[in-house]
Regions:
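Alpha-helical transmembrane segments of multi-pass small-molecule/ion transporters
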Residues: 1-361
């Protein structure tokens, strides 16, 4: 194990501290925000390059894929409803933004964190298309249900749906690296020389994964910290909401998946806790513009609502990675030694020496 692999959690925390420290520099926050999609795309490329995409099918991970999709579609909304009512009882644009981000399971860097923590990351990748499809279908359904039962303001929900077509462009940092990695793997199967070239690419991708994760964490903290700190009255409630959700969802996912293997349980737990804020943020920003155009003064708080979830989740992911690595990685299974004692009711026999036994005459 290399130096970066042994100390990656400390490197992640250090990167986040550097990003927060650089957030106050003039123009740095804006530049960092522009670079986040590219850093995310590079990180996902290195992750996808290490996976056997051409030989992967959802049938290999059917149980895991079904579990994470059903959890995201039906389990998470049951938990989100009372939490949003408790922390944001107003039901306005802030509550709507929180609901949208909490109902969207992560499909990008959750794969990276799961791999680092020792989970079954290939199963999460196989479930990615189904998680994306479930989000597109069920987020409008659940937000409408929340509005009907009084958790969200019906007027606010009615003003944002259907989602603008530009919102689907937010999937670009995910789809482009995935398709590129798949095409390169298909290309490498044509000849042994291409396979050797791809093996070198895999080796470089494995080496670059931790530095790219550090870069992404630093850029995200630098880009989003100023917007979050500007809303000092709102942040404690939002941070409490997201932290409470992460704890309850993580504990519930871990214990409800106890029939699975340890790697699958880690994957289910990470999938239940991690949200799709990087993909959802442009969508929420477009919804905020629509509400602001209609004269809603709270629309400007929707962006900070999503960004608070991002920063809170980064700390939670780093902590979860450290916990799982400390608890499970490099743990040696003790071997059961034979019992040296001999039961009293069993006759002791002399060891076999290769010669016939001597008997007294």
């Amino acid at each position: 194990m290399s130096f970066m692999e042994r100390h990656q959690v400390a490197l992640y925390l250090g990167s986040m501290i550097v990003g927060v420290a650089c957030a106050g520099l003039s123009g740095w926050s804006y530049a960092s925000e522009q670079l986040v999609p590219y850093a995310l795309g590079a990180l996902l490329w290195t992750n996808f390059a290490l996976m056997p995409l051409t030989g992967m099918s959802v049938g290999q991970y059917k149980r895991l894929a079904c579990t994470v999709v059903l959890t995201a579609t039906f389990g998470t909304p049951i938990l989100v409803a009372p939490l949003v009512s408790l922390f944001i009882p107003e039901g306005g644009p802030v509550a709507l933004a929180a609901v949208i981000v909490l109902l969207a399971p992560c499909v990008d860097y959750v794969v990276v964190f799961t791999r680092i923590a020792g989970g079954e990351y290939r199963g999460l990748l196989a479930a990615t298309p189904y998680l994306l499809g479930a989000q597109l279908i069920f987020i409008p359904v659940w937000t409408s249900i929340y509005a009907y039962i009084g958790i969200l303001d019906t007027r606010v929900v009615g003003e944002i749906f259907p989602l603008p077509a530009e919102s689907y462009l937010s999937l670009t940092p995910l789809i482009v690296p995935l398709v590129a990695a798949y095409l390169v793997q298909r290309w490498s199967t044509r000849s042994p020389q291409r396979q050797q070239t791809y093996e070198r690419v895999r080796s470089m991708s494995d080496t670059a994964m931790i530095p790219l994760m550090c870069l992404l964490l630093a850029l995200m903290c630098s880009a989003y910290t100023p917007a979050v700190l500007n809303e000092t009255q709102l942040i404690p409630r939002l941070a409490g909401l997201y932290l409470t959700y992460a704890i309850l969802a993580g504990v519930a996912a871990w214990f409800l998946s106890r029939a699975m293997s340890r790697a699958e349980r880690i994957s289910v737990t990470f999938s239940a806790v991690t949200r799709n804020a990087l993909i959802i943020y442009p969508v929420v920003a477009l919804c905020a513009q629509r509400l602001a155009h209609n004269g809603n003064p709270e629309a400007k708080l929707m962006g900070a609502t999503v960004l608070t979830q991002t920063l809170t989740e980064l700390l939670i992911m780093v902590a979860m990675t450290a916990i799982f690595r400390a608890a499970f990685q490099d743990r040696k299974i003790p071997q059961r030694l034979p019992n040296p004692g001999t039961p009293k009711n069993i006759e002791r026999r002399p060891p076999h020496t290769g010669r016939p036994p001597l008997y007294k005459l």
